[in-house]
Amino acid sequence: MWLKRLHQRFDVWFTDHFLSPQFESLGSDHFVMKPWNLRVYGRKISAGKNLHVIADSSRKVSLSTWAYDDKQGQIEIGDNVLICPGTRIDSASKVLIKNNCMLAAGTYLTDADWHDIYDRTKPIGTTKPITLEENVWIGDSSIVCKGVTIGKNS
């Protein structure tokens, strides 16, 4: 029992010292299980209160934003959000996840094509924002592509 509490304290310490500085803002009462398996890349990534992330060495979690031309990707995560192992969120435009959402294992959210369909050397391609309204649950291994809005309580 004491060993489990010690491990949880270490997870909190690791998150506060190594992951928090990578977020533009990170709300209170967050918890990341195995935080060394969460990859935060890019600017303009923020999360609200009570974010819970479950990461694993075999199913890492990735939050990535990309800049191109004069644009910057953005990920905004609301309060009370659960992100499960293997989730990837990539943004070249904007991904908005509102309060009380759950992302099951292996989900992928992307707001860009990541290349043009005619000229594959053209970076990023077409982008359109993604919005998950409040109380949305994205099921196991789901893919949410550019321009999608999922309504409240879905």
Regions found by a protein language model. Name each.
Residues 1-110, 133-134, 142-144, 152:
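Domain-scale signature associated with acetyltransferase and cell-envelope carbohydrate enzymes
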Residues 61-63, 116-121:
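A short, acidic/glycine-rich surface segment
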Residues 70, 121-135:
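Glycine-rich NAD(P)-binding loop of Rossmann-like domains
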